[in-house]
């Protein structure tokens, strides 16, 4: 059976055979090589030129040439042998410690002792200049120092934010309770957990109201911040005793206009039984005042028990000498059970601190 010859084995006549005598190999003799990704073709490298400064030729010195060292000074000449002696005497010392010891010893030498080493250093300098007339000092490039790790500034920002927030709270607190001319923080009279809010009041100092405000039912806070706490409690006493001496219409006006200090220690207008006396509640906000405005007298009076306050608010009808208004009864501090609220304990302490309430008549 005859097989046809494959096409790649045939010799096709080319038109350049008669013109050019160059022999062209047949197509089947040239092996077809496909480029593999593992062996990429090497790029053509430029041929090095004998002229310096071109291509890959070194421009300063040949790699094989040794580096020319600087001539030694007088200290180096003296320390060359002295370092060996110290290293033999103290083999456990570090090289840096030896260098410090050598430097201190060189400073302690006199000029006469340094003279031979200075002369030897000058001789070496002249010899070095003769051996290398074209020598130029080229310091080695220093190694790049390791970059210092950047400290995360988030704790600092948090601390600064906390400090700024504390200062903002202080400024808000200063706006709510202006001082009587003192700018120190001590004059705020802020109670600590170890003291009661009533401890900042001096019992010997009497309460004072202007003459034009004695006849009014609601005297304004005519005191500094330290007396603002007491005035808030006096306000509570007057509000409790109002049903016996004033009409409900006046009472509604009192309940709708609480003082800022009373709101500071009791922002919700109720009994602060859940908050210790030594701790301060957050500063008052506008929503608390608006919520207090919407409450009626009946809702507020529902939280009070008149029978409980009658045993603490027995005020005398007699007037003290020198005071044009009734004076509260001076009595010994009473022991209050633990089950009662902290508001009752605060009012019992207030009754012993010479608070004067002109509105209470019975």
Swiss-Prot record:
The lineage of its organism: Eukaryota, Metazoa, Chordata, Craniata, Vertebrata. Residues 235-361 form the Sox C-terminal domain. One of its GO terms (biological process) is negative regulation of Wnt signaling pathway. Its main location: nucleus. This is Transcription factor Sox-18. Residues 149-209 are annotated as: Important for transcriptional activation. Residues 135-149 have a biased composition (Basic residues). Residues 1-68, 129-159 are annotated as: Disordered. Residues 68-136 bind DNA. Binds target DNA via the HMG box domain. The 9aaTAD motif is a transactivation domain present in a large number of yeast and animal transcription factors. It is found in: Nucleus. Residues 1-13, 59-68 have a biased composition (Basic and acidic residues). Transcription factor. Binds to the consensus DNA sequence 5'-AACAAT-3'. Also binds 5'-CACAAT-3' and 5'-AATAAT-3' but with a lower affinity. Acts partially redundantly with sox7 during cardiogenesis, acting indirectly through nodal-signaling to induce mesodermal, organizer and endodermal tissues, which then interact to initiate cardiogenesis. Also acts as an antagonist of beta-catenin signaling. One of its GO terms (molecular function) is sequence-specific DNA binding.
